[in-house]
Every structure is written in C-alpha cells, then in structure tokens.
Amino acid sequence: TPTAFYGVR
C-alpha cells in the first residue's frame, strides 16, 4: 500500500 507512505502516490 503506497498510500501508507506517500499518501496519494
């Protein structure tokens, strides 16, 4: 889950 690190990316 990239959103967990980037938030939107």
Swiss-Prot record:
GO cellular component, one term: extracellular region
One BP term from GO: neuropeptide signaling pathway
Keyword entries, A-Z: Amidation, Neuropeptide, Secreted
Disulfide bonds: none
Signal peptide region: none
Modified residues (Arginine amide): 9
Tissues in which the UniProt entry reports expression: Expressed in the CNS and midgut but not in the ring gland, thoracic perisympathetic organs (tPSO) and abdominal perisympathetic organs (aPSO) (at protein level).
Major location (coarse): secreted
Domain of life: Eukaryota
Subcellular location: Secreted
Reported function: Myoactive peptide.
Protein name listed in UniProt: Tachykinin-related peptide TPTAFYGVR-amide
